[in-house]
Amino acid sequence: RVSRGLGDVYKRQAAYEAYISEDDVPHSIYECEGARTCAIELRSFSKNAGFTGMRLGFTVIPKELMCDGVALNPLWARRHGTKYNGAPYIIQRAGEAVYTPQGQAELKAQIDYYMNNAKMILTGLKSAGYSVSGGVNAPYIWLKTPDGMTSWQFFDYLLENVNIVG
């Protein structure tokens, strides 16, 4: 509502959408009321399908999205058609495979594996007495560094004393 009232355009990166496990968390910005008039969603295969480095994704710009009275969708289509020749064919085919039943099953297994690792790390760090959060809807864990250490000091501590790159 704030974006629409101010005329702002909100960009949402949805690379981790496949990791969302909570029922009350939207999988797309467009599940939010009014978002089609003020939001652009960026989707990537890098996080859900392990396509990091292959550069395959897509941008959703609703036809309802206007900026200063100008529809952004046709401007983006024109810009994209002029400046970008498309992903290599083999990468497009890999992206297509993501949507097959086998691809979906493999994605689910990979995501489950990453989320299970996050859960083990979270549990282990909590049991070691650290203040941690995360591991829900994304495979990342946030840790409060102990004793006022900076992140670099803690990185060095882990590397030198525990042989972990953290």
Which ranges hold each PLM region?
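Conserved glycine-rich beta-strand-loop-beta hairpin in the small C-terminal domain of fold type I
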Residues: 96, 111-122, 132-145, 151
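Conserved core segment of the aminotransferase class I/II
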Residues: 31-112, 119-123
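Conserved PLP cofactor-binding pocket of PLP-dependent enzymes
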Residues: 16-18, 134-140, 159-166
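Single conserved hydrophobic/aromatic residue that forms the stacking wall/gate
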Residues: 1-10
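Short strand-turn motif at the edge of the Rossmann-like AdoMet-binding core
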Residues: 14-16, 44-45
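Conserved catalytic-core motifs of eukaryotic protein kinase domains, centered on the activation segment
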Residues: 21-23
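Short, conserved active-site loop motifs that form the nucleotide-linked donor/cofactor pocket
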Residues: 39, 130, 164
